Amino acid sequence: MSDEDLRGTVEQVGRGFNLGEYEVEAYLTVLRHGELTASDIADRTDIPQPRVYDTVRSLGDRGLVELRESRPMKIVALSPEDAFAGLQEDFQEMVGALEAEYTQPARNTEAVSLVKSRSTIVRYFGDVIAEADFELVCSLTPSLLERFADDLAAAVDRGVSVDVVVSPARNAPNPDAFDYAAATTAARGRRGITTPVIAVADGRYSVYATQDAVRDDSDRYGVIFDQSALGFLVSGFFDTVLWSTATESLYDPATELSLPRTYAAIRRCVRDLQSVDESVYATVTGRDVLTGADRRIQGRIVETRFEESGEVATIIVYTENGDRVEVGGRVAALEDVEAHEIAVARDAPPAL
């Protein structure tokens, strides 16, 4: 489609939907009754009697109703499918042509971005969920949970661990009506409306906003973090503040931990390992706490230390060289290694 044709199509679609207040009111009234006279329309609407004839003739010119020139004139409803068929074709043609012109912008690579509109904030939630490769944590309102149920289920299907907090808990979908098992690997409800909405993919890419910001409050902002060192802050907040105080269980499979599995958050890793009795092995990538140099260690996990408060979360790995290496999370100070990713398996150190 040429630029001139594209512009004409867009203008035509715009004109097609340019209905005034009286036209909309008259059209819906005729549509609901099937056939009316001008007097009937005046009686059933707030359209002044002198304006009724001009209004219905405008609808007739657009092909939305049929005018039968009898005494009195009769205005007959037409099937919306037939009446809007031409507009549908124009619209589909326009969308196809616009799609061909569209260049998808690269994802913002800035460390921190502020976004204001509700639609943009919600779009970023979809982006974060889609980006998750192995770990996804979300704090969602009930409406956001239902909106992104299919996206969350797709993440679960591709092997992503999905922990979800729903707030306010009193409005969370009933487990008998909502398939938490399909959309999450664990879900809890949290009391009150003060809980922020959050999504963090693999401890790196994240979005943070207040509940007001996703209720179309134009004075609120969402914050996008696109670096692991910053996404970790949101992930840590989720683990230590939100998850630990979400007391209503919505879905807890209470099954044997599925391994191999990769973690971005050491707290979640250590918490899960509390339920494992047999030997497990780990591959850890991160950096040396003292020198800042990149570190990669592999070996058997011989000890874990964990407190529900989140203040302590450590694994000790016995390497093939006979070293005992203490591994902590982001900004670790007491351990030997600051872990960025931890892969855990039962039989041998997994690939990472």
Curated annotation (Swiss-Prot):
PANTHER family: HTH-TYPE TRANSCRIPTIONAL REGULATOR TRMBL2 (PTHR34293:SF1). Does not bind DNA in the presence of high glucose or glycerol. Disulfide bonds: none annotated. Keywords: Activator, DNA-binding, Repressor, Transcription, Transcription regulation. Residues 36-57 bind DNA. This is HTH-type sugar sensing transcriptional regulator TrmB. It comes from the Archaea. GO terms for molecular function: DNA binding. Belongs to the transcriptional regulator TrmB family.
